[in-house]
Amino acid sequence: MTVFVGIGDAAHDTSIAALIDGEFKYRKSERNLGVKHHEASENWYKQTLNDWGVDKPDRLCYTDKGKVRGGKSVRKPYNGEDAIIEGDSVCIDHHTAHLHSTLSNAEQHAVFDGRGSGGNNGRYTGLIVTPDEKIRYKHLGVGKMLTYLGHVLDFKGLKVDFPGKIMGLQAYGTPDLELASQINQDNILDLCEPWIKKGVTSKDKDFQNFVATVHKACELIQLDYFSKFDPDKLIACSGGVMLNTVINTELRKKYKLYIPPHVYDGGLSIGALRYAVGKDFEIPNFPYIQDDWAPEEPSDQTIDEAAELLAQGHIIGWYQGHGELGPRALGNRSILMNPTIPNGKDILNERVKKREWWRPFGASVLHEAASKYFDIDDSPYMLYNSNVLVNGLDPITHVDGTCRHQTVSEASNSSFYRLLSKFEEKTGLPILLNTSLNVGGKPIASDKNSAMVDGLDCIFFGNEKCTKIS
């Protein structure tokens, strides 16, 4: 048996990936243990390998929470006399793992990390790789800048979620372009201080404008970073900041981007595995690769019943196959709803999701019909914002007229494609509101128990329909 292992040992969203005689395996600790953004212990990695029947990998590569100095790990849990996992091992820095995680042969690679690489004393937020050069981009991580705004509003929960929440709020404000061009790592804290003293809320219009201004500053920083690339050649992108759909959409207007769904730290293990193997490899059924419980494929009868319930206005859970890679629901771990229901966003939020009032919901659309409803017709991983081209889709239309949508083809997700097609047959609309199968503060579901979310009318596990949710 030949075994290669990659460990994404980070401060949050830890994971492990392996090639075992060519068979790909992936497990994320938050899904496995039910703790959002979980940071795994070394023993969890060892237990996972035991579950997979692995005792001693032929080659193991790991990231050491960004704490690499001169190519050497600060701590040595996977090598030396005290190693908890025996085998040939190497430690790589955070950015290097992100870079390899794209599994792309693109000539240009961009790593844009939210907080900077600890492997370089926390000073660098970006890594640019072109055929001619490698450039460390020195700037305070834009994710950290947006996190400060979450502290101003006294957000609860984990700060790794703050930038995503701010991304939704910025649409309610109007940026001051002159100020945005001046905001940097030296003055951001001073600019936030008056708002902290004032004690603002998310509905304060002046603060919404400030949020929009800081977000615009982050966009300008990232546009400057990308200006070093050749816009005519593909850029493979990674790093948690690349989950920002607003900025991604601006970049897309000028550059050819490949952004995989696992750009965040949950993809580090895949990058570490790529480094261990030394070459790209195929991942079957990508991105539906979570090591979790998977029910049987739904029948045509089940698809018809689910589509009918959605057409009638019910909110349903949709748990099919293995879970998707990354933080976005892509049709296997989803809460679904008819996107034409009046006040649908508020109904869903009050009954089920219980998120901040300003945060929008995404949508999924049949790939071949996308251009009729959105101005971006290819978005398989929900990583761009598109302008909504028709009226009457209020539950999925943000205040700025955009929607973060997923395009679904039969090849990408057959079961979900069939459901969307059947819903279109019943309603004339090939779109469903799609949000992740979880509630605030919890990870996306990985088994029956975690999927039984209060407030759903019903949930489908393959062909099994459950109606007693709470």
For each predicted feature, which ranges?
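Extreme N-terminal starter segment of soluble prokaryotic enzymes
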Residues: 1-5
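Flexible beta->alpha loop and helix N-cap segments adjacent to enzyme active/binding sites
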Residues: 6-38, 76-87, 91-99, 104-178, ...
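N-terminal phosphate-binding loop and adjacent alpha-helix
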Residues: 29-55
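Phosphate- and other anionic-substrate recognition elements at nucleic-acid/protein interfaces
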Residues: 42, 46, 61-86
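Short glycine-rich phosphate-binding loop at a beta-alpha junction
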Residues: 54-68, 232-240, 317
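Short acidic-aromatic active-site loops that bind/stabilize oxyanions
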Residues: 89, 204-220, 409, 413
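A mobile "lid/hinge" subdomain adjacent to the ATP/sugar-phosphate binding pocket shared
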Residues: 176-206
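Phosphate/ATP-binding catalytic cores across multiple sugar-kinase/actin-like superfamilies
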Residues: 212-235
